[in-house]
C-alpha cells in the first residue's frame, strides 16, 4: 500500500466524523471574532514603526540560534522588559509559547518527580508532559479537592510540579491560582503557569494571573502573539531558572531565534499594555454585553471574565454548519471540535477584542439568533 492510500483512508474517517480541517484565507468583508489580538496591537502603527526600524538594522531573519549567531541587543532588551513586566528576576525568549511550554516541562521535572496537570491544559503542556521523564497525573478541571488528593498521594515523589493554564484557551475559565499556590506551599510543590491568554488582559496593569491574584508562581510562561500583538514566547522567573533553561531546554538551544523586528514590536507593545487600563475595561464591558445577550437569546455560554466566549453547540457537524452560516452573514467565528475539546462539547469560540464596536456586536448577536433558529438550537 502506498502512503497516500493509507493516509487517504484515515482522512476519510476524519471527514466522516465531521472533524476535517482545511486552511482558508481571511475575507476582508467578514468581521473577525476569532483573533487573539485582544488589545488590537498587531496593527498598531507604533509597533509597526518599531519593527521597521529593527528590520532595517538587523534584517528579516535572526540567522541562527541565540547561542550561535542569533542573539541581538533587541533580544536582550525584550527579555529585560518581560522580566520587569512580569515582576520576576529574569526572562528567556522562545520562538513560540508552544516551544516554551515544551522546553520547560521536558527539562525541569526529572525521573522520580510527578507533574500534576489540569484536565483542560493546552496541547503544548500535554506534549511537554509526554516528553518529560517525570510521571504525569491529571486532575479535574479547576477542582482543588481533586488536586489536593493527588498531591497527598504524591508525597513520596522526589518533587511535585503543578502546571496549569492561567486562562484556559477553549473555555475562557481562569485557574484559581491563589488556591493552587496555597496547596503548593502545603505540599511542597512547584507551580508552573502558562499565561498565554492572560498576559495583557488580566490584572490592573495587564500582567496576567499573577497580578490578578497577587501571587508569584515559580515559573511563568507566556506568548507574545496574542494580546502583545507580536511573535514569540517566553519564560519568566528567577535568574537560576533562566540559566538552567538556557543550558537544558532543547527547544531553546536548538531553535532559530525570534526575528529582531518581532522583539522590537513586542518591546513597544509592553510599554503600551501597562497604560491600557481603559482599553481593558472597554474590552470587559463588551464581553459582558455579548455573554448576557447570548444567554437571553437562549444559548449556553461558558467562560469567566475573559475575552474568550465558548458558545456550546454539542454536535460537531452542527457546529461546522453554524460557523459556515455565520460566514455567509459576514462573521468569522470558528467551530471548535474534538479532539481540541471533548466529545459532545463542540462549540463556537468567540474571542472579543478591544477593536470591536457596537455595530459589530449587534451584527454578531443577530447572526447568532438567526443561525440558532435555523439549526433549532434556540426558540
UniProtKB/Swiss-Prot annotation:
Keyword Transferase found: yes
A GO molecular-function descriptor: pyridoxal phosphate binding
CDD domains found in the cross-reference section: KBL_like
Known cofactor(s): pyridoxal 5'-phosphate
Domain of life of the native organism: Bacteria
Pathway the protein takes part in: Cofactor biosynthesis; biotin biosynthesis
Residues the entry annotates as binding pyridoxal 5'-phosphate: 97-98, 169, 194-197, 223-226
Swiss-Prot/TrEMBL keywords: Biotin biosynthesis, Pyridoxal phosphate, Transferase
Modification N6-(pyridoxal phosphate)lysine occurs at: 226
EC number: 2.3.1.47
Binding residues annotated for substrate, in chain numbering: 21, 122, 340
Biological process terms in GO annotation: biotin biosynthetic process
A Pfam family it matches: Aminotran_1_2
Record-linked InterPro entries: Aminotrans_II_pyridoxalP_BS, Aminotransferase_I/II_large, AON_synthase_class-II, AONS_Archaea/Proteobacteria, PyrdxlP-dep_Trfase, PyrdxlP-dep_Trfase_major, PyrdxlP-dep_Trfase_small
Enzyme class: transferase
Catalytic activities: 6-carboxyhexanoyl-[ACP] + L-alanine + H(+) = (8S)-8-amino-7-oxononanoate + holo-[ACP] + CO2
Function description: Catalyzes the decarboxylative condensation of pimeloyl-[acyl-carrier protein] and L-alanine to produce 8-amino-7-oxononanoate (AON), [acyl-carrier protein], and carbon dioxide.
Family classification: Belongs to the class-II pyridoxal-phosphate-dependent aminotransferase family. BioF subfamily.
Quaternary structure annotation from Swiss-Prot or TrEMBL: Homodimer.
Name assigned to this protein: Putative 8-amino-7-oxononanoate synthase
Organism: Bacillus licheniformis (strain ATCC 14580 / DSM 13 / JCM 2505 / CCUG 7422 / NBRC 12200 / NCIMB 9375 / NCTC 10341 / NRRL NRS-1264 / Gibson 46)
